[in-house]
Each structure stands twice: as C-alpha cells, then as structure tokens.
C-alpha cells in the first residue's frame, strides 16, 4: 500500500496532501498547510523545509510529488516559488524519497478532466474522489490533486 505525499509549494502557504491506494481505491490519510509568517524569505524557507520534513517523518511516504513551476509575469514571485519548491525537494531528497513533478495543467486534466479547471472544480473532485465529508482548503486540495495524479499516472506507467 504505497503512500504518496503531494506538495503545492508557496512562499506564504505550502499545501500538503497524503493519500494511499489499496485495490484501486484511493485512501485519504491527511492534508493541511504549512503557513509562514512574514519574517523574511530565509525564515520562510526554513519553516517550509522543517514542515515538509515533519510531514515526511509523520506519514513515511513512498513517493514525493510536487507541482512544477509555471512561468509567471512576475519574476520575483516565480523566483520565490522556485525557492519554496527547492527546499521542499531537498527535504524529500534528504529522506531518499523519489521526487516526481507534475504541471498544474496535467494535474487538473487528470483530476477534473479539464486542464484549465478552476480551484473550486479541483476542490470538488478531490472531495469526491477521496470521499471526504467536506472540501479541503484550496492549497491542501491542490496538494491532494497532485498526489492523486501521481497515483493514476504512476500506476498506468508501472503496468
């Protein structure tokens, strides 16, 4: 029963979602957000690294999946997002986890069936696919969607 950790990186809020799969059934294990205060970028990156490390220790995932950086019109935002991704990936690498990256359009296409889906559609489908009593917040839903994408695509390519 492989455990998959999905990460939706951000310099202010990093979402995480943990799922497993048993007999082609998705199983929700946990989700949430790592929130960083406005104490400067180095401190934020430290909190993201520590938070991801703690989540890895708690859930012991077999796979680490993260959203790829998209090109942004705001270079500063793209750089901060890249740095947040980097420290999350280092946390996974320090635990010898295999790292998989998925584009946002690919995640939306896999989970919703539409690569241009909005956040509400992603939340709805994540809730439906994981049989959750309520929709997770958008950052956690995006992270769970990344994990679901890995579950579908990795299983497809493994056979």
Curated annotation (Swiss-Prot):
Keywords: Cytoplasm, DNA damage, DNA recombination, DNA repair, DNA-binding, Endonuclease, Hydrolase, Magnesium, Metal-binding, Nuclease
Binding site residues for Mg(2+) 2: 67
Protein name: Crossover junction endodeoxyribonuclease RuvC
Record's subcellular location: Cytoplasm
Enzyme category, top tier: hydrolase
Transmembrane segments: none
Binding residues for Mg(2+) 1: 8, 139
One GO BP: DNA repair
Gene: ruvC
Enzyme Commission number, as recorded: 3.1.21.10
Catalytic activity: Endonucleolytic cleavage at a junction such as a reciprocal single-stranded crossover between two homologous DNA duplexes (Holliday junction)
Top-level taxon of the source organism: Bacteria
Cofactor(s) needed by this chain: Mg(2+)
PROSITE patterns xref list: RUVC (PS01321)
């Amino acid at each position: 029963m492989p455990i998959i950790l999905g990460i939706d990186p951000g310099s202010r809020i990093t979402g995480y979602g943990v799922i497993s799969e048993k007999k082609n059934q998705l199983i929700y294990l946990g989700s949430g957000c790592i929130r960083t205060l406005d104490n400067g970028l180095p401190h934020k990156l430290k909190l993201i690294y520590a938070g991801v490390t703690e989540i890895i220790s708690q859930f012991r995932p077999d796979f680490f999946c993260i959203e790829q950086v998209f090109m942004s019109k705001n270079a500063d935002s793209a750089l901060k997002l890249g740095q947040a991704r980097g420290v999350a990936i280092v946390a996974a690498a320090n635990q010898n986890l295999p790292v998989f990256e998925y584009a946002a359009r690919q995640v939306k296409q896999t989970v919703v069936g539409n690569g241009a889906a909005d956040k509400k559609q992603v939340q709805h489908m994540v809730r439906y696919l994981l049989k959750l009593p309520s929709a997770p917040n958008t950052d956690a839903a995006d992270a769970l969607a990344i994990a679901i994408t890995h579950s579908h695509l990795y299983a497809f390519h493994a056979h």
